[in-house]
Structures are given as C-alpha cells and as structure tokens.
Amino acid sequence: MTAWRAGVRRGALAGLSTFLTLVLAGPVYAGAGRFSTADAPPTDKIVADVVSVNGSGCPAGTATVTVLEDHTAFRVTYHDFIAVAGGGSQPTDLRKNCQLGLLIHVPQGFTFAIASADYRGRARLAAGATGLQRTNYYFQGSPDDTFVDHPLAGPLRAVWHTTDVTPVAQLVFAPCGVFRNLNINTELRVNAGTVAPGVVSSMSMRSTDGDIDTIFHFSWKTCP
C-alpha cells in the first residue's frame, strides 16, 4: 500500500515539485536515469570531495558521497542520522542536522545543476507523534533560503521516500570554469506529541536501517 502527500515548499523556488511516498511493503527506488537532462553526462572522470561536515546528524566519518558510474547522479549515505523523541530521550535528540560541503570536480567544458533529489529513511512514530525531513542545497555564494519540508504523522512504522524536482526553467548551474562548493543541509525532527509522550518515536536516514540513501540527480550543460 502506498500513500502520497505533498510536502511544504518554502523560499525562492516556489515551483519546486515535491512528493512523499510511504513504502509499507518494501522500499521503492527511483532510478537515476528517469529525469531528463539538457546535455548528455560527460564521460570523463567525475570526483566528489567532501570538504566539510558539520552537524549532530553526521559525526565525523559517518557520511559518504559516491558518484554513480553513469555520471547521472551522486549518492549520499548517512550512517548515524536519527532523531528521537519520547521515552528517555534528551532534548538534543529531537532535532538532528547534517551540513555537507561538496566540491564536485567535473571535466573541462561542462557544468551542472541539481535537477532532483530522492531521499529515503525510516519512520517509527507513535500515535500523536510527528516527524519532519527538511533539506536545502545551494552553491557557495548563492542564496540559501530555499528549503523543502516533508512532514509525517503517527502512528506510522514504514520506510519513507521523498522526492524534490526543480523545474527546468529554475535550474541553478554552477558557474563555468569556477569551483564552487555545493552545500547540502538536511534536518530530521521528531515531536512525541501529547497522546503517548512516554513512547519512543524516531525518524532516521541511516544505512543501518536497510537500503537507505539519498540520490542527487545532475542536469548537465556544456559551457560556451
């Protein structure tokens, strides 16, 4: 059984499309090639360097980045990203965030934008509890006020899958010939609510919870 619900869009890119899938019978994976790009991906090597990692959701050494072999996307894997509320949890457990700074080395003559992003995680929310996944991403020197919220409500025990898609006319490409960090900010929040505040609720994006990762899809363009 699959349920669909729209997320909440905030910031400058009001046209950003977003949807949420709750996967109750098993995870659903959005293939890397299903979003069209302006130009074909470059065939030469692409490297994604993690230049900075900050936040309570990704202690040092717990987040990895891998470029897919077909150069259509890159994968972010978190190993210890979980927010918890209720029971004996601490106030600092209710909200976890991870801020990644990536430097993506692309072949000369190419530039890229982020066309879409697929997020997956697991929710264990008691009755009355709520959860939230929030993300924004932007190039160094660009406005960072665009973010997307995906709320969840208990009772819920499921793998969730959310997707954000940027309209072609609103794609933001990295400047040609200039190295700019791509900053990715992701946040998880859980509120135990008042129905069963003593029951533990959680929302996670940990690879230890199954086939859990985040895929950022490139849109490629050749430079003049």
Q: Model regions: which residues?
A:
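A short, structured loop/turn motif at beta-sheet edges
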Residues: 69-72, 105-112, 126-128, 139-145, ...
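Proprotein-processing/basic-patch segments
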Residues: 190-224
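Cysteine-clustered segments with highest specificity for TGF-beta superfamily mature ligands
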Residues: 75-77, 157-201
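Short, solvent-exposed beta-strand/turn "edge" segments of beta-rich domains on protein surfaces
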Residues: 86-95, 104-113, 124-126
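An exposed acidic His-Trp-rich patch
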Residues: 115-167
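Secretory targeting and sorting signals
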Residues: 2-30
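N-terminal leader/pro-regions and domain N-caps
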Residues: 31-87
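Beta-strand elements of well-folded, non-transmembrane domains
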Residues: 80-82, 100, 104-108, 118-127, ...
